[in-house]
Swiss-Prot record:
A Pfam family assignment: Amidohydro_1
Intracellular or extracellular location(s): Cytoplasm
Name used for this protein in its record: Imidazolonepropionase
Sequence similarity: Belongs to the metallo-dependent hydrolases superfamily. HutI family.
Amino acids binding Zn(2+): H77, H79, H245, D319
GO molecular function, one term: iron ion binding
Organism: Haloarcula marismortui (strain ATCC 43049 / DSM 3752 / JCM 8966 / VKM B-1809)
Amino acid sequence: MTTLDAVVYGADELVAGPATDGRRLETYEDGAVAIVDGTVAAVGPTTEVTAEYPPESANHAVDADGQAVIPGFVDPHTHALFAGDRSDEFAAKLRGKSYQDILAEGGGILRTVRAVRDADEETLLSNLLAHLDTMLAHGTTTVEVKSGYGLDTETELQMLRVIDSADAVHPVDVVPTFMGAHAVPEGWDTDDYTAAVVDEQVPAVESQGIAEFCDVFCEEGVFSVAQSRRVLEAGAAAGLTPKVHAEELAHIGGTQLAADVGAASADHLLHATGEDIDALVDAAVTPVLLPGTAFGLGAAYADATAFRDRGAPVAVATDFNPNCHSHSMGFALSLACVEMGLTPAEALIAGTKHAALALDRTDGLGTLREGAPGDAVVLAAPSHVHIPYQYGTNVVDAILKDGSVVSTPTHESYDREVQP
């Protein structure tokens, strides 16, 4: 027995996903989507979809007249599980302090590490659930969350447990990434800590069986290419797909490493070269660009057009973390357009379909095509262009996750848009 979960109909613009006919997007005017048993069953003109799937027979019927409907956002790079407050560091940066200055004074990542180690599991879960609520309210229906603020076996495992617990109770799908190699903890030599990650943390993470990916901060002054390779190869042997923070602050070869190890994604990439981009394309590694990070630091942005023009499937993420405190994929897409050179259509693809590729999702996630997960966002605007156009504004009006209309503490008006 199948269940007609939802029918969204009458949309001024319904975006099914990237087009295959020369257009950027496959769109429908007066469009509709039907979701059955959590999966998209039909998408197309309202007259055709509703003839087969009558809205009055659905658990949720959404009249989207005057509105646009898009796939739910996929945020493929966050550090959303943390404790403590580093807002004072934002003010310090405005006064001219560099991140390196702040780190030398005991701030930055290591300050968050101390706060996470001091927090109990209940507090960490509460923090993460609150962040997921806000992300959901801004249209994110799938998000990757990394560990990496523990930097010891016990706390890294605790973080992964919390991520798993959040995934079990929250509507947003939460994808877990182990990142013990996020920084070198206080009192450690980098080689010794790399060995601890490889010999102690990775086997413990494998035994726990929660993490899906293994990430490393391959950067000058953090983990070298050789050290990063050790971590990623150990993770791969434990069944964890590699990811790489690469070429953020300097060019040291992290992008080529990502290609060599067959990473799902290489992220940041501010200093990637044309040769690096070609290597990613050849190895089918998705580049993930993080405009919010540059915005928060007042730094240069990656050139998305360089990746696009070489055939790379550019993805965009928030990089939500204590040093980049934005939950909003919409804001990230605005920056990707204004500062990185993407069009609104390209930015939407970067935050949906291509973002799903960065998480190795090939089930249609990030689209509204037949067989894809039933994750859709109804905008309080008639076109997807309003996402980057209304920068700083949350244009999300209603969210469907697996075919169910989801409300959040910050969005309690959905009932006005939904007729059961």
